[in-house]
Amino acid sequence: MSEVPAAIQEELNTLRETINDHNYRYYTLDDPSIPDAEYDRLMRRLREIEAEFPQTITPDSPTQRVGAAPAEGFETVSHRLPMLSLDNAFEEQDLLDFDRRVRERLKEAEDARIDYCCEPKLDGIAISLLYRDGYLVRGVTRGDGSAGEDITANVKTVKNIPLKLRGEGYPAELEVRGEIYLPKAAFDAINKDAAAKGEKTFVNPRNAAAGSLRQLDPRITAKRALEMCCYSVGYFEGELPGTQHDILTQLQQWGLKINSQMKLASGAQECLDYYRHIMSVRDQLPYEIDGVVFKVNRIDLQQELGFVSRAPRWAIAHKFPAHEEMTELLAVDFQVGRTGAVTPVARLKPVFVGGVTVSNATLHNMDEIRRLDVHIGDTVIIRRAGDVIPQVVSVVQDRRPENAVPVDRPEHCPVCGSDVLQLEGEAVARCSGGLYCSAQRKEAIKHFASRKAMDIDGLGDRLVELLVEKELIDSPASLYSLKAPDVAGLERMGEKSAQNLINAIEASKQTTFARFIYALGIREVGEATAKVLAQHFPTLDLLKQATEEDLVEAPDIGPISAGHIRSFFQQEHNLETIDALLNQGVSWPEVVVRSTETLPLSGQTAVVTGVLADYSRDEAKDLLTRLGAKVSGSVSAKTGFVVAGEKAGSKLTKAQDLGVKVLDEDAFKQLLEEHQAHLGGEA
């Protein structure tokens, strides 16, 4: 490898310094000082030198933004400090209430004015950047707030994220948080290019940014003109300024982009003025926003105010109303979802709203249709709720034509003809066809074959879809008529795997009553409820004949669940499917009815969270249920104890805050050993 001449090394250093300076002016300050052609010439020369003298390439060179080879997946990384979400304000009064709460907690006078740092709320992807000694070492998505995906290789392709901080005085370790987004012009260019190639276009810039960041090949990410805007810091070692505004200003001096619309406001009224101003210029901004964020400016006051479980008390996001437009309602169709929900869909005269052309919109349910008094032929107002999902929000009554037609709920399922029922207390009408309805067929069979139901090994979702599409099965019962030659010719199936599948289907005939009930897919009947039903109604005939009054006498069965169960067993199609399953040989041993009152954990509510080394979460829940405990998905003051494994998150924190007893895995094992005698067979 030849030695680098001094003159070349000097030119190299000058090129990098010059290019970094232009990147800063272009991407961070939005104030370019040279034409694009001149910038391209500088980059070409830098690449030429590095190609001739590869030993000169450094991780922070401007040329290293183009991604490396594709990754095989993303590693999960825990955030040292949680990346919490913000509480929302939707009305001006919500913001005034927030300001009042802040002043009350700080014991300020009623007429005191708190200083707030105000910024537009970018509609992008939250990201955490970690700098060590000024060098970017890691980029992680927000994820669930406690842990996210390591997308460092992709983050390094975002041109306004410095690979090395400018200047000096930055902390030895500094976590910077912000939003990665796709500017409107870049979004339009990507979609225009995709449309020209006949490819699927993105719905909105946020989806495009998310899809770009999660590319396993950073070279694809590099082709997208993503940008980042910083809004806060997380963990850091050293000192930073004492206000939100000054911290962001300091980040800008270190080479990171902050929002040029950032402003200080004194008191709630100035915050409202800022909100109205940003809303008025929203469409002129080069990026999508969905509101503004207000943060108490002084860091010491932020620390005094603290946090609730999921959000800081010192910040709030004031959301904008969704974009709206008027158009004509041409028709209302009723669609049947995979769970049987019968949903009205408005067919509209196409209208451009919120950046897209909308021709369909949700009407949610019949209650909403009645509330709006919707007629076919009406002029309606369409809103893109959350700037994503179009919905009908109102009717322009004075434009109703004389021939407008009211919208009635269908009495029968538009797919299978079964009764459409709407139970008291429920807004959604549902097809009662259950296992029979073809709209629900694939999902019904997937559920029937799942591990917690009939546990048919090897019958995954994709194979179910293939079997239905090839018309080899049309109901759960038809699974038991399959023969090995029927499936041997399917994708990724051979004679051996086909026979293994048939053997697994045959083995599933021997099950338990609780599993069979769960496998039927009755609405509101989960695994725990199925076990309750099997204990309370130990034969199929007793369960089929149970009235709603009988059902609500069973533990934890409420009137809504009882209504669903009763409705299911009243439908002839469902009874025929059950008979077909029994005729195919599905059976279970007689249920041994246990008295839960004598079980050691009777009357106690337990919660399982985190990762256990020797038990899946479902196994742990099952063991607790068999000891008489009621297993809940959330922690409250009524929780008896929490079983917490590794990486336990917010549930563990809440349990500790409430003083609820916490068992680690060793203590859980000890509990099981103490009551081993009660862990008998399954219902």
Curated annotation (Swiss-Prot):
Pfam families on file: BRCT, DNA_ligase_aden, DNA_ligase_OB, DNA_ligase_ZBD, HHH_2, HHH_5, Nlig-Ia
Domain BRCT: 596-683
GO MF assignments: DNA binding; DNA ligase (NAD+) activity; metal ion binding
Annotated binding of Zn(2+), by residue: 413, 416, 431, 437
GO terms classed as biological process: DNA repair; DNA replication
Classification via SUPFAM superfamilies: BRCT domain, DNA ligase/mRNA capping enzyme, catalytic domain, Nucleic acid-binding proteins, RuvA domain 2-like
Enzyme active site: 121
Gene3D superfamilies for the chain: 5' to 3' exonuclease, C-terminal subdomain (1.10.150.20), 6.20.10.30, BRCT domain (3.40.50.10190), DNA ligase/mRNA capping enzyme (3.30.470.30), Helix hairpin bin (1.10.287.610), Nucleic acid-binding proteins (2.40.50.140)
Matches recorded under CDD domains: BRCT_DNA_ligase_like, LIGANc
Recorded catalytic activity of this chain's protein: NAD(+) + (deoxyribonucleotide)n-3'-hydroxyl + 5'-phospho-(deoxyribonucleotide)m = (deoxyribonucleotide)n+m + AMP + beta-nicotinamide D-nucleotide
Keyword annotations from UniProtKB, A to Z: DNA damage, DNA repair, DNA replication, Ligase, Magnesium, Manganese, Metal-binding, NAD, Zinc
InterPro entries: BRCT_dom (IPR001357), BRCT_dom_sf (IPR036420), DisA/LigA_HHH (IPR041663), DNA_ligase (IPR001679), DNA_ligase_AS (IPR018239), DNA_ligase_CS (IPR033136), DNAligase_adenylation (IPR013839), DNAligase_N (IPR013840)
Cofactor annotation: Mg(2+); Mn(2+)
Residues reported in the UniProt entry to bind NAD(+): 36-40, 85-86, 119, 142, 179, 295, 319
Top-rank lineage group of the source organism: Bacteria
Enzyme Commission number(s): 6.5.1.2
GO cellular component terms given for this protein: cytosol
Family under the similarity heading: Belongs to the NAD-dependent DNA ligase family. LigA subfamily.
Role summary: DNA ligase that catalyzes the formation of phosphodiester linkages between 5'-phosphoryl and 3'-hydroxyl groups in double-stranded DNA using NAD as a coenzyme and as the energy source for the reaction. It is essential for DNA replication and repair of damaged DNA.
Record-given protein name: DNA ligase
Source organism of this protein record: Hahella chejuensis (strain KCTC 2396)
Gene that produces this protein: ligA
